[in-house]
A protein has these predicted regions:
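Outer-membrane beta-barrel domain signature
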Residues: 25, 46-52, 88-94, 135-141, ...
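Structural signature of outer-membrane beta-barrel domains
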Residues: 41-45, 80-84, 124-128, 169-177, ...
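Membrane-spanning beta-strands of outer-membrane beta-barrel proteins
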Residues: 54-58, 98-100, 143-147, 191-193
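Predominantly the C-terminal beta-signal and adjacent terminal strand-loop region
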Residues: 148-204
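Gram-negative (and chloroplast) outer-membrane scaffold detector with strong preference
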Residues: 32, 64-146, 152-160, 202
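Bacterial Sec-dependent N-terminal signal peptides
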Residues: 1-24, 204
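Short glycine/proline- and aromatic-enriched beta-strand/turn motifs that initiate or cap beta-hairpins
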Residues: 19-76, 80, 201-203
């Protein structure tokens, strides 16, 4: 009976320690970061945005939450500007601005003690506005599309709080503009952006 009680106590102690350890391990993976950034976004392919603008450039801020082991969630907001290079294509409108949100999941790989790579897959929303040249108001449209990319991360301090992040991403853009001719509809509503970003990341 004494041996049975000792054995039972040992099992209870091991189980309690194991559960405590699992809980501790899970919470140890939770990390947050904030990323002020600058971006350049180039339209690719045969489409209205590629023919109308040189490129988009902007700045913004992002946040990441590492939830479990190497997986996490992130969001970025960027305010973009662009210059019109072909007024005939863009119509009676001035240079546009764009509000962009990128929502994504990421997986982080540790390459060395100071160097990491993040793989990203998510969804983007866009709101583009352009003033009419006669100052009578603004034209605006909203749209969205998938995004996927990769980030290279380098740690710049001994504690691991500060990092420099270089990213490249493909953003798919779909404005859903209808036309009886599907080629014209695709030309004015669909595009792919090649996105380059540079950010300072602070982890906490």
């Amino acid at each position: 009976m004494k041996k049975f009680l000792l054995f039972s106590l040992a099992l209870i102690s091991i189980s309690t320690f194991s559960q405590s350890r699992k809980k501790q391990d899970w919470t140890e993976y939770v990390r947050s970061s904030i990323d002020p950034h600058v971006k350049v976004m180039l339209p690719l392919g045969d489409n209205f945005l590629k023919d109308s603008f040189d490129y988009f450039y902007g700045f913004g801020i992002g946040g990441n939450l590492n939830i479990y082991k190497n997986f996490g969630l992130g969001v970025e907001y960027t305010y973009f500007l662009a210059n019109v290079k072909n007024g005939d294509k863009f119509g009676y409108l001035g240079s546009p601005s764009m509000n962009n949100f990128d929502w994504y999941v990421f997986h982080k790989d540790k390459i060395t003690e100071d160097f990491f790579v993040e793989k990203i897959l998510g969804y983007s929303t866009y709101r583009m506005k352009s003033p009419y040249l006669d100052n009578s108001g603004k034209f605006s449209e909203g749209n969205g599309g998938l995004n996927l990319g990769v980030k290279a991360i380098y740690t710049i301090d001994n504690e691991g709080f500060q990092q420099v992040v270089f990213g490249t991403k493909l953003n798919f853009y779909n404005a859903k503009i209808g036309n009886q001719n599907p080629d014209i509809a695709d030309y004015y509503s669909k595009a792919v952006f090649l996105n380059f970003s540079l950010a300072y990341r602070y982890n906490f």
